C-alpha cells in the first residue's frame, strides 16, 4: 500500500504495482481501451496497438492516427512497421510535454484516482481484476464533462441501439 492510499509516504509495500498500464483513448468520443501489461517494450506496445485497433473497430471506430509519447515501445521499429502496414499515421508528443496528449493524460489521472488508488488492493492481481468493471463503468455509465455529462459510448450509437454494441 502506497502513500496515495495511506497518505503517508513512509509506508509502502514492496513488489506491488510494477506493471505497466497501456491506454488508448478515442479523441472524439473519449471511449477508452486499457490493458495492464508486464512491460512497455516494442513487442508489447505493438501487440497492444493491434488489440486496441480491433477493439475500437468492434465499436465502430476506425483508427487513422495514433498519438503516443516517446516511450521506447512507441519509438521502436516494430511499432512503426505496424502503423505503416495498418495505414495508421503515428504522431508523437513533444518530449517532456504531457499536455500535448492532454486527453489521454486526463484519462490516466481519472483511471489512477478512480480505479488504481481508489482502495487498497491486497495485490496487483486483484487490482488488475477490478479493471474491466471500472472500464465498463467509465465507457458506458460515467458522465464525462466534455461530453455534457454523457458517457463516451453515447457518442457512437443511437440511444435505442446500445444493446447491439454491448453484445
Where are these regions (language model features)?
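Mobile-element integrase/transposase regions
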Residues: 1-25, 31, 47, 163, ...
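Active-site beta-loop-alpha junctions of metal-dependent nucleic acid enzymes
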Residues: 10-11, 17-19, 35-60
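Mobile genetic element proteins and their domesticated derivatives, centered on retroelements
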Residues: 24, 30, 48-49, 66-69, ...
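Short small-residue beta-strand/loop micro-motif enriched in glycine and branched aliphatics
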Residues: 31-35, 91-93, 117
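RNase H-like polynucleotidyl transferase catalytic core
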Residues: 63-70, 85-103, 119-122
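Short, well-ordered alpha-helical microsegments
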Residues: 75-77
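C-terminal domain-tail junction helix/linker
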Residues: 86-88, 110-167
Amino acid at each position: 500500500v502506497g502513500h496515495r492510499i495511506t497518505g503517508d509516504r513512509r509506508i509502502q509495500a514492496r513488489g506491488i504495482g510494477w506493471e505497466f498500464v497501456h491506454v488508448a483513448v478515442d479523441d472524439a468520443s473519449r471511449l477508452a481501451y486499457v490493458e495492464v501489461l508486464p512491460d512497455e517494450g516494442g513487442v508489447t506496445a505493438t501487440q497492444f496497438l493491434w488489440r486496441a485497433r480491433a477493439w475500437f473497430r468492434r465499436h465502430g471506430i476506425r483508427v487513422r492516427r495514433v498519438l503516443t509519447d516517446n516511450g521506447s515501445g512507441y519509438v521502436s521499429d516494430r511499432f512503426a512497421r505496424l502503423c505503416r502496414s495498418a495505414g495508421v499515421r503515428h504522431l508523437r508528443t513533444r518530449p517532456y510535454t504531457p499536455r500535448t496528449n492532454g486527453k489521454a493524460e486526463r484519462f490516466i489521472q481519472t483511471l489512477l484516482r478512480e480505479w488504481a488508488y481508489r482502495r487498497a488492493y491486497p495485490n496487483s492481481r486483484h487490482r488488475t481484476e477490478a479493471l474491466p468493471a471500472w472500464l465498463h463503468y467509465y465507457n458506458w455509465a460515467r458522465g464525462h464533462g466534455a461530453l455534457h455529462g454523457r458517457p463516451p459510448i453515447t457518442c457512437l450509437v443511437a440511444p435505442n441501439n446500445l444493446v447491439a454494441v454491448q453484445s
